[in-house]
Structure formats: C-alpha cells, structure tokens
Amino acid sequence: MTSHDPKAVTRRTKVAPTKRMSRFLKHFTVVGDDYHTWNVNYKKWENEEEEEEPAPTSAEGEGNAEGPDAEAGSASTPRQSLDFRSRLRKLFSSHRFQVIIICLVVLDALLVLAELLLDLKIIEPDEQDYAVTAFHYMSFAILVFFMLEIFFKIFVFRLEFFHHKFEILDAFVVVVSFVLDLVLLFKSHHFEALGLLILLRLWRVARIINGIIISVKTRSERQILRLKQINIQLATKIQHLEFSCSEKEQEIERLNKLLKQNGLLGDVN
C-alpha cells in the first residue's frame, strides 16, 4: 500500500488556490510590469509553498551569494538624472497615482449614476437642467484626464503598452466613451448610444478592481524586497558567526594540544 505524505498533501492543497490566483492575476498586468517575466515565471506563486527544503549546500550557498551580490551591484549603480519619460514612468508606477485613479473612477461612476437618475426622472431635475449639465461637464473633464493618461502611457511605455490586455481594454472603453461624450456635447437630444455610453462608463468600475490589485501587488513586492534585504543581512551575519566559531574551535584545539604537550590537561580536567 502506498503511504501518503500528509505534508505533501497539505502543500498541494495550498498550491491549488495559489495556482488559480496566479493564472488570474497574469491577465491584470499593467504597464510597468515585466510582461515576459510575469508570463514565464508566474508559477512563483505556487513555488513559494514548495520552498520548505533543507539548507543549501556550500555550492548552492555560493551561487545564492552571487545572486544578492549581483542584485546589490545592479542596485548600487549610480542614478542618472531622470528625464521626462522616466519621471512619468515612476509616476504611473506609484501607489499614490493608483489611488488617485481609483478615486476618479469612483467619482466618474457616481456622476454617471446621477445623470442616469436625472434622465429617468427618478430624481426630479431643475427647470434649466443645470445639475445635468454640471454633472456632464465634470464627467467629461474626468474623461479628458483619462485620455491624457492613455496618451502619456503610450508615449512612455510605447510597444509595452500593447502587451497588456487590460490596458488595451481600458483604453478602448475610455476612447469610445470620450467620443460618445464628445458627440453628446454637441447634440441637444439624447440618442441611442446613450445606453452604450452609460454601460461603458459603469464598466470602468473594473478599473477599481485593477487598481486595488496593483496596490496590493506593489506593497507585496516592496515587502518581498525588504525581506530579501533582511535575509541577505542575516546570511552575512551567519557567515561571520560561523567563521568566528571556527576560529574559536581552532583556538581551543591549539590550546588543548599545548596542555597535552605540557602534561597539564589531566590536572585541568
């Protein structure tokens, strides 16, 4: 009869949901993510659960030591002065920018809902329709900001922008919504595309989900980087302690030999 390792079974139960999550998150990559690395190495989510193995051998330790040194070397390269594209790239990858985008998307969704309630007469509008006009122009201003965001993202990331499906879909929704909203500005009557416009604008709530995922992923990457740095420091400290212990052991052996040679070891014991 074959014996089942309970630890292996537990590991498989942990890996299964992690594997599903990794396959789901790889479709939510955005500009700034390493597209090829994410698609090739997305199994790192499940591999993290399988890293509970014995300590590496000396050869592996040397290999691992080369890795941090290489990373430290690459990180210690002098920073060049940031040009306009580099500053924009840093801005688009920042956590604060994602929070601003989420807030604007929420505000845009609320404005569209308010317009919808006024159009359906659920909320009685004023006689001059000032509220509808104000909501519409505010929503259009937010769309202009999103259009500028897409333009500068394409300017900064170029072909990398088109490697991310979610960015393409989000850009499509923004552009179509912008065109329809622009037509509505010059049309006094409501036309048949108004329902499509509302549907597209409300669909952008998915951007909120994407922003939350990016924020969580960014914080996780920062935490992983911090833990790696702590791990490197602890590994260096362990090496120093092991070297110090070996020196102490050699010194003890040398002193024991001297005691034996002088016949003092028995008296000491």
From Swiss-Prot:
The chain crosses the membrane at residues 97-117, 135-157, 166-186, 194-214. Changing R207Q: Same activation kinetics as wild-type. It catalyses: H(+)(in) = H(+)(out). One of its GO terms (molecular function) is identical protein binding. PANTHER family: F20B24.22, VOLTAGE-GATED HYDROGEN CHANNEL 1. The voltage sensor domain (VSD, segments S1-S4) conducts both gating and ion permeation. The segment S4 is probably the voltage-sensor and is characterized by a series of positively charged amino acids at every third position. Unlike other voltage-gated ion channels it lacks the pore domain. This is Voltage-gated hydrogen channel 1. The lineage of its organism: Eukaryota, Metazoa, Chordata, Craniata, Vertebrata.
